[in-house]
Design a protein with these regions (language model features):
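Secretory targeting and sorting signals
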Residues: 1-40, 508-527
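Loop/turn elements at helix/coil->beta-strand transitions in domains of secreted/extracellular proteins
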Residues: 113-117, 183-188, 276-283, 313-318, ...
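Active-site core segment of subtilase-fold serine proteases
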Residues: 43-45, 49-262, 276-278, 392
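Substrate-binding/access-modulating region of protease and related hydrolase catalytic domains
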Residues: 197-345, 406-411, 415
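Extracellular S/T/G-rich loop segment that most often corresponds to the catalytic His/Ser-adjacent loop
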Residues: 344-426
Length: 540
């Protein structure tokens, strides 16, 4: 994992060196800076139309229609019954989360995100023990729970729990390497969509509790102390297909998908509900609606835009996944960046949303991450480890079953977004006087900027987040806000040798030829990296 960190840092440094020294790489396909993106004369593409506040819906606090369960809920796999996952995710090391958390604890009486509530709008969140009573019911816009849980605290799909775990999980086992970004923050769960539910008139009778088919274990209550490696799909007696698996393929979790629960209207209603509560400081939306760009805006999109604007006006930081490429969500790789092929909502409304692209463990942009002028920042989105979403499981998951016995790594922009939402919670805890706009600006300004005009591009936005910098740097834009001293840090470099002028002379003598050779080599390596074949793994 540490190797990925070093390689990623080297890529950023060498890219900046190339652009700054020879000045010819920036025009080669690099997107225009965000301020240069304007709507086409014949419609709205890169930039949405102005907000129409009259489109903000009234929250009905219930599903938009009756949905019934068509597939069984996610379960633990037989293969994962006795597997313990103690490995620290590469993303934690890459982002130096342990150091970031210590900085906040030093400033906030030992708490890392305590007192900050983060709303997770997703497939629901299972009551995993590693939330340690920091999980609250927000609401359910899909259906009533099947086992008496409070609204929003059932996760049949196995998606929302993994997202929430990245934000705020706090394992009580010191041997476990995984920990959430803001492990003292509180999660408020809203179940807004599910691929395991469908409109009642189009579905069969829900399967009886405990009825499953396929490969998962029949036991939903694992032996005490065991940890799950695989949160597999289950198809349920009354449904067909791959259970929870479709959410990890073909574009990830999508709103307005035929035969499933989850609409733009209910997403907008939840945002209004959150805005009216006055206690939630951060929102994470790892749900998207992706469509072909046609120059227009739909009624549902207008509702979401108005609701997002309303929530942002209530001092709430809104974070969204940038979206995953799929059959119905084409990559924005067109020559004219002002006219994307694909529109993704909520990220499209970038004035009020911080959308997050994904990188892999080499520091490269993940091939499934949708590009666009709305991308704000980027974070780790591959080889994910998080909480096992199966009901009753006390452990972690790092794989998901796909098509029966096929296991796949957990990945997607869905899991990059919670890294940023967690960071927003830490920033809000450390700097309680900053408003939502200032928090977003701090995250952007302290990110590792790409070598592109304006310090941003359409792939990673303003760059990969840098939590330590976001929690320590003083920004000129924050008048009167002073970043506190991060305190002494452990030295990362060996002590300097005795002074000698010989190395300096040799280094200077070889600079001319060596730099040219280095630039040529790195340019070739970068070209090869950009043209590598895309992995075939599914995304969520």
């Amino acid at each position: 994992m540490a190797v990925g960190r070093r390689f990623g840092a080297t890529r950023r440094t060498t890219t900046a060196l190339l652009a700054g020294t020879i000045g010819v790489l920036a025009p080669l396909g690099v997107a225009l800076p965000v301020w240069a993106q304007t709507a086409a004369a014949n419609g709205y593409y890169a930039t949405p139309p102005p907000v129409d506040d009259s489109k903000r819906p009234v929250d009905e606090k219930k599903p938009d229609k009756t949905y019934t369960q068509t597939k069984g809920c996610v379960q633990r796999a037989v293969l994962g019954q006795n597997v313990e996952i103690n490995t620290r995710p590469w993303g934690q090391d890459y982002l130096q989360l342990a150091k970031a958390q210590e900085i906040v604890r030093a400033a906030r009486d030992g708490s890392a995100g305590g007192g900050v509530k983060v709303a997770v709008i997703d497939t629901g969140v299972t009551g995993h023990p590693w939330f340690q009573n920091r999980l609250e019911s927000g609401g359910d816009y899909v259906a009533g729970t099947t086992k008496g849980q409070q609204p929003g605290l059932e996760d049949c799909d196995g998606h929302g729990t993994e997202v929430a775990g990245i934000i705020a999980a706090k394992p009580d086992n010191p041997e476990v390497g995984f920990v959430g970004v803001a492990p003292d923050a509180t999660i408020v769960s809203f179940r807004q969509l599910s691929e395991n539910y469908g409109p009642a008139k189009e579905t069969a009778t829900p399967p009886p509790a405990g009825t499953t088919s396929g490969t998962p274990s029949s036991s939903t209550n694992p032996p005490t102390g065991s940890e799950s490696q695989l949160p597999p799909s289950t198809t349920g007696g009354g449904g067909e297909g791959e259970g929870t698996s479709p959410g990890q393929t073909n574009g990830g979790r999508q709103l307005e998908k035929d035969g499933t629960a989850g609409t733009l209207k209910t997403l907008a209603e939840i945002l209004v509900r959150i805005a009216d509560r006055d206690d939630i400081k951060v929102v994470n939306m790892s749900v998207d609606n992706c469509r072909v760009a046609d120059g227009g805006i739909t009624a549902g999109e207008q509702q979401v835009q108005a609701a997002i604007h309303y929530a942002a006006s209530k001092n709430i930081v809104i974070v969204s996944a940038a979206g995953n490429v799929g059959d119905k969500c084409l990559q924005n790789d067109q020559p004219d960046s002002r006219k994307p092929k694909t529109i993704v909502t909520p990220p499209w409304f970038a004035d009020d949303v911080l959308s997050v692209g994904a990188i892999d463990d080499t520091g490269s942009v993940a091939p499934f991450s949708v590009h666009g002028p709305w991308v704000g920042v980027a974070a780790p989105g591959t080889k994910i480890i998080s909480l096992d979403p199966a009901e009753g499981s006390p452990g972690l998951a790092n794989l998901t079953f796909e098509s029966g016995d096929k296991a796949s790594e957990i990945q997607g922009t869905s899991f990059a977004a919670p890294y940023v939402a967690g960071l927003a919670a830490l920033v809000r805890a450390k700097y309680p006087d900053l408003d939502a706009k200032q928090v977003i600006n701090r995250i952007k300004e302290t990110a590792q900027h790409p070598a592109a005009p304006g310090g941003r591009d359409n792939f990673v936005g303003y760059g990969v987040i840098d939590p330590v910098a976001a929690l320590t740097q003083s920004l000129p834009s924050e008048v009167g806000v002073v970043a506190s001293d991060p305190g002494p840090q452990m030295a990362q470099l060996p002590p300097a040798n005795d002074h000698s002028s010989t190395p300096m002379i040799v280094a200077l003598a070889g600079t001319g030829g060596g730099l040219v050779a280095l630039l040529i080599t790195l340019f070739v390596m970068r070209t090869i990296r950009r043209n590598r074949p895309e992995p075939t793994g599914p995304v969520r």
